[in-house]
Swiss-Prot record:
Keywords for the protein's UniProt record, in alphabetical order: ATP-binding, Ligase, Nucleotide-binding
Binding site for ATP: 150-158, 360, 375, 462
Pfam families linked: AMP-binding, AMP-binding_C
Name of the molecule in the record: Uncharacterized acyl--CoA ligase YhfT
Native source species: Bacillus subtilis (strain 168)
Entry annotated with the keyword Cell cycle: no
Family statement drawn from the similarity comment of this UniProt entry: Belongs to the ATP-dependent AMP-binding enzyme family.
Amino acid sequence: MTITHTYSSTAETSPGRVAIQTESEQITYHDWDRLVSQTANWLRSQPSMPNRVAILLPNSLAFLQLFAGAAAAGCTAIPIDTRWSPAECKERLSISNADLVVTLAFFKNKLTDSQTPVVLLDNCMADISEAAADPLPTIDPEHPFYMGFTSGSTGKPKAFTRSHRSWMESFTCTETDFSISSDDKVLIPGALMSSHFLYGAVSTLFLGGTVCLLKKFSPAKAKEWLCRESISVLYTVPTMTDALARIEGFPDSPVKIISSGADWPAESKKKLAAAWPHLKLYDFYGTSELSFVTFSSPEDSKRKPHSAGRPFHNVRIEIRNAGGERCQPGEIGKIFVKSPMRFSGYVNGSTPDEWMTVDDMGYVDEEGFLYISGRENGMIVYGGLNIFPEEIERVLLACPEVESAAVVGIPDEYWGEIAVAVILGNANARTLKAWCKQKLASYKIPKKWVFADSLPETSSGKIARSRVKKWLEESVQYK
């Protein structure tokens, strides 16, 4: 069984159902099943069959076709971000050891320094259209079909792989815990380079639903599709959802939002619910390595708005102290996860343990709901006291005058490290200090403040903390 094995059965039972709809084209399951088979057979017919296929394409039907075709052929698909510089593309292709990269002529200049063979999309599409749609050989479910890169929010990106089995286990969470089915029309407004949006599209196709794919995120365009296409599910990240909440005139029909939101302030969720009362919000905590860990249902979000939720049906979590002992409810420790959805490992790394941690810190309450404190390697040690930047950011983002915020630790001769806040918005340092004083212990209040016009983000829409820290250390005068 693979992530594509349901396509043929959906094509048989619902041949005319739309599989993918973009701003310029659409395809039925009958044609989608055939196209994926042709793409897989084209890859397998190459003189030297590629094991690893890089995809440097914008959001499009062709992107999903090549991704699914590579998976069906037994290859590992490697999405490459169109926003990366030539040096970044070269680095990722080198790390991944890709056998070929499929791209558009427009992006070919990004690959001039790379040794990876390049195939232009127009050329391969002509060959694929003539390929047979013959049955494909059985693929081992443990075989890696997807290689991604950690977002780099805290350091140098690393490549990781996921197996067919791990994503098929994740699909059961989408079906069981999010209650998404073949009846749903799912809007994917973000870049398929992000595993969150890629997963949203691929899981929808596995379940037999319809993927509605935007070229790139635009609040106005997302609203247009929500109103026009009877969208029932929307995949987002908090920054996108906050932008959507500022737009009026959303449809009255219920829409289910699936958001990776462990760092999503409760106040932002309340604003969204007020602006869009018919939504059903599911936010989850997960990582590239662990996949889904915990989630909050619409009812959970109202009852425990600051929680990252409870474990998915096939996940177990434990909070452990520095000695490896299990923590009591309310006691902060390192989060360990046991899950059939975990990744296969980092490229050139060891096989992951049964119980895994990515060094995130948190605690559980008496009911088993998880609360995220922060990441151990992002922790600020201020005069021997531990400060988690995420806790301060949540407080700052609750201030009406703050649009976005990032908190990092900067070396200090006396304290060891101090917390520095970088702010987008109309607030000033005096206002924010007073705001924090009401909600934080005094030692957690940032000691320095920087006001900026923008904050660097990773490809998944998160603040790139390492770049903020580097920028502060190299060039900024503090307030």
